[in-house]
Amino acid sequence: IGMIRYGSQHLTGRDLEFLKDLPVSMTVQNDGMPDLMMCHGSPRNLSEKILPGHVENKEIFADVAPKYILCGHTHRVANFTQYGKTVWNSGSVGCPLNGKSKAEFMILHSKDKQWEVEFVTLDYDVEAVIKEMREKSFYETAPFWTQVSEQLLRGGTVAHGTALNRAMELCQMKYGECKWPMIPEECWEQACAEIFTEK
């Protein structure tokens, strides 16, 4: 709930309209180059993951015309071909799940009317980012999301999804039901305490 609260405090009505109007996926065309399908999760769902080797990819790719798919959501670099599609995931600039405290991105180069992908990792001032998170009151607004983010920035490997899943399990056990994003902070707190104690 905390990051939703933070977002609602900082996004304008115009920002929200812009986000609402964005398509789930879009095809990008460049003269003389193969088309690119761009999406956050998958071409059909913002929250769906495209993972190497998953049989579900056959169904995900069924209605996708372009050969190349650029996606994100997993916070992990990916470069694979399956069911006639090549998938590139740039990883994450802010919270990569690489355990290395490095920003990740990719550059697409055109060469002989084909795409060549270059994956890049860069060092950056992680402590400055964490300091800014504290200055902007992230710990007050979204303490447990921020706790997970900080350990990722410092090279940890516990994903937000891991904490979210455990918090939802605890919410379900305590209240009989759990609907995202309405997860009580006490469940987040217990989930993070368990996860980081195990580490």
What are these regions (language model features)?
Residues 29, 39, 118-120:
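Beta-strand residues in well-ordered beta-sheet regions across diverse protein folds
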Residues 25-28, 77-81, 104-108:
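Short beta-strand scaffold segments in enzyme catalytic cores
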Residues 44-46, 70-81, 95-100:
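Active-site environment of divalent metal-dependent phosphoester hydrolases
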Residues 83-90, 94-199:
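Acidic, His/Gly-rich catalytic cores of divalent-metal-dependent hydrolytic chemistry
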Residues 22-25, 74, 92-95:
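Glycine-rich, charged/polar anion/phosphate-binding loops
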Residues 67-68, 116:
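Short active-site oxyanion
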Residues 1-28, 33-35, 45, 51-65:
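Active-site neighborhood of divalent metal-dependent phosphoester bond hydrolases
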Residues 39, 68-75, 87-91:
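Active-site neighborhood of phospho(di)ester-bond hydrolases with catalytic His/Asp-centered motifs
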